Amino acid sequence: MKLRLLSGALCTAVALGFAHPALSAEKAQDFVNKAAEGGIFEVESSKIVQGKVKDQAVNDFAQKMITDHGAANAKLQSIAGEQKLEIPAEMDAMHKSDLEALKSANGSADQSYVKMQQDAHADAVKLFQDYAADGDNAELKAFAQQTLPTLKMHQEMIEKIASG
């Protein structure tokens, strides 16, 4: 009886050991998916509003998003490639819908863009904080830790613009 119980426990432990790398890959891939979709959205939405916004601070912020998130996106793509993870080919439906709303905005898109960037940066900061703390891939975890201060700075900038 004890031998049967021990054998069952050992089989379960071995099975869980083999299952763990798959769980890790899924978690890393999930981070890559969300980080890439968010990063692409921040660049593309910023490109759309340049010239459509009236507030110079918003325009300057949009340019910074193109530069900073463009660089972060390239670094993420490089790390993902090295780690054999895939970058999503396109954004999710919500981000696509937000881009369409910006494209079709009549007149100034300041308020819509600022709100979208507030939401995007709140999501990004949480995603990167969580992965920096509990990430399962050392390279991606380091990327999250290195990128987080910039995301927090962006979040502070957009909150200041929104309140001003």
Locate each region found by the language model.
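His/Met- and acidic-residue-enriched segments that coordinate or traffic transition-metal cofactors
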Residues: K2-G164
